[in-house]
Amino acid sequence: MALITPDYTVITSDVDEGKIAADTPAHLAQSLASAKARAVAKLHPADTVLGFDTVVDCGGEVFGKPQDEADALRMLRALSGRTHKVHTGVCICKGGRAAATVETTLVHFSPIVEDDLRAYVRTPEPYDKAGAYAIQGHAALWCAGIEGCYYNIMGLPVHRAAQLLREFA
């Protein structure tokens, strides 16, 4: 966010993500981001509020943050040697107006050796990340390439968010 503006505050919403449903993983990311932004905007109506949510789409199956080591291993094994999509929903709320969009990036993973997977899930890195990996961390070793926004994979599509902010200025 600091790339977009130096003046921001992070506020966590109280949205129950389990109650949000959508017809596609991309729509889910957008719906979650919208719900989060709208919840915070209700508490801070005079402010410009941005909400984000990222999901990993592996052949139509949604991967959020892993619950435990077994869940992280399941996700990473599914991603190994495959191309998947990372969808980040972005919603802006300001002065009673709102707009939402979604950014999608294709990520190509090389096959991952089982010992590397097991070592990785013993670190703290995968547990607060959709899809159980941090592209800017050790998982960069498995990334054969991307198509789209790199920052989207980290959960904040900088260009798309900056566009929305300019539109609402």
Model segments located where?
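A short linear boundary/processing microfeature
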Residues: D7, D16-E17, R82, T123
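Anionic-ligand binding patches
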Residues: D23-A169
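Short, conserved active-site loops that position catalytic residues or coordinate cofactors/metal ions
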Residues: V10-V15, G51-T54
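A short small-residue
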Residues: T12-I20, A140-W142
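Short, glycine/acidic-enriched capping/hinge loops at junctions between secondary-structure elements
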Residues: A2, A21-A22
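N-terminal G-site helix/loop of the GST-like fold
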Residues: M1-I11, F168-A169
